[in-house]
Amino acid sequence: MKMRPRYSVIASAVSLGFVLSKSVMALGQPDTGSLNRELEQRQIQSEAKPSGELFNQTANSPYTAQYKQGLKFPLTQVQILDRNNQEVVTDELAHILKNYVGKEVSLSDLSNLANEISEFYRHNNYLVAKAILPPQEIEQGTVKILLLKGNVGEIRLQNHSALSNKFVSRLSNTTVNTSEFILKDELEKFALTINDVPGVNAGLQLSAGKKVGEANLLIKINDAKRFSSYVSVDNQGNKYTGRYRLAAGTKVSNLNGWGDELKLDLMSSNQANLKNARIDYSSLIDGYSTRFGVTANYLDYKLGGNFKSLQSQGHSHTLGAYLLHPTIRTPNFRLSTKVSFNHQNLTDKQQAVYVKQKRKINSLTAGIDGSWNLIKDGTTYFSLSTLFGNLANQTSEKKHNAVENFQPKSHFTVYNYRLSHEQILPKSFAFNIGINGQFADKTLESSQKMLLGGLSGVRGHQAGAASVDEGHLIQTEFKHYLPVFSQSVLVSSLFYDYGLGKYYKNSQFLEQGVKNSVKLQSVGAGLSLSDAGSYAINVSVAKPLDNNINNADKHQFWLSMIKTF
């Protein structure tokens, strides 16, 4: 039997199988795999920007102003002393000293020299380094300069949060306590990673230590908002399970004192044709801020509309675990590494024709994602991931009705990428551009396909309009930000989206003349009114610029409202 893109009783009966899901996707019939993919669009996390510079490294000498150009003398040698008055090797300062040694200098020149030495060490990771010109008698043109690199003194903790003191100590032992000196990159990493911990606010304070050249570190931690919840409503659902969706969720932080987080999300479409529940629990497990988490997801659906007579319904449950590590944390660059494992059980039924489909999918995903302040007032975001999957497929369909390439078991590999840039412009304007896509080594089951439509794709089409094995999306958006009311922001935008892809990686089983590629594009405008931590209202309208989807809507109107507590 060859695959046909038209609807038939037999096609509908076997469409829930892996290979027969090819005809299904061309027709737009949802199943557990495609519905899970649509929900994943809703679960996309907001992108985290780098914080920007944390510490001011300028080291202005207090002596520069009081030393005026006066008596000069020939400088023959500069001795650099540490805080124990021991001479240190100065090879790394040769490029600075050569501008002074062998020349006639004044006290003002020596002050400038000390300042240059301070700046050199501060720009080479010694955050509080200071070169001092101590009182001295200059003999035979030899000048002594005291170099204080900034030794770690006392580290004190003022913890008024639910975060464990033991965890903070372990985190400091892998950063600020790894050197005898206060190093800028380690202190920055400590500040950034501890502020990544949910449910806390942290601050650092440096002060002079008891000994010469020492600096004490005070760590202040207070509870932030540990409990939060939300309710939301939108019209982003599938037309066969219900356009309107109601969702609610809650999040609790620091239950065990190790930066753990528990999240619960519930969702139902109108008439309850689609129900979904998701739980995610994660906790930090070491002093390097590595996070281990477990997830569980349940979905139940029943189709209406054109597929109601088939009595199509199904359910799925997914169990997963993941490791997330902040590989690089600097003020202008973030890089995280994630490894996850998921086990999915998907069941679809068409009771009118007595067809039942079961699939079990085990997948291992490894990936990186990050952000970079590469350009002034701009942030670049990126991600790369590879998924290795194993599919076990069972169907009640008779062998003579199955398609030619039906395989009870198969392996597959999927590659995903994303690159985007957000640029702040003058007069409260901004411009966003992004590209993302997917490659696969073979034809995929519906839960692994890429959706070209929806709010994360070509916004002039519904999420299930085109589901492809390989595809690419380009999105551009021009925004304007306007403060309104007391704390709200109104964002207006114009956007253009373009997507293209291949329905099936392997097309040799398609009938001749059946089109395997698709291109979508749309333009639109949107408005968003929000108050961070309180509410958000988003409205957008998009119009397709193509006629490549049969019976496609003439436009899409997207609405979502969320209230947070």
Curated annotation (Swiss-Prot):
What the entry lists under InterPro entries is as follows: Hemolysn_activator_HlyB_C, Polypept-transport_assoc_ShlB, POTRA, TPS_OM_transporter
Name the PROSITE patterns on file: POTRA
Q: Which Gene3D superfamilies match?
A: membrane protein fhac, membrane protein fhac: a member of the omp85/tpsb transporter family
Residues in a coiled coil are: none
Q: Recorded GO terms, molecular function? A: porin activity; protein transmembrane transporter activity
Q: Where found, per UniProt? A: Cell outer membrane
- GO CC entries: cell outer membrane; pore complex; type V protein secretion system complex
Q: Which GO terms describe its biological process?
A: monoatomic ion transport; protein secretion by the type V secretion system
Which keywords describe this protein according to UniProt? Cell outer membrane, Ion transport, Membrane, Porin, Protein transport, Signal, Transmembrane, Transmembrane beta strand, Transport
Q: Per the database record, which ranges form the POTRA domain? A: 73-150
Where it mainly occurs, coarsely classed, is membrane
Signal peptide per UniProt:
1-26
Per the record, the domain comment is:
Probably a beta-barrel protein.
The record, for PANTHER family, names:
HEME_HEMOPEXIN TRANSPORTER PROTEIN HUXB (PTHR34597:SF1), SLR1661 PROTEIN (PTHR34597)
- State the family it belongs to: Belongs to the TPS (TC 1.B.20) family.
General function of this protein: Likely functions in the release of soluble HxuA from the cell. Probable member of a two partner secretion pathway (TPS) in which it mediates the secretion of HuxA.
Protein name as it appears in the record: Heme/hemopexin transporter protein HuxB
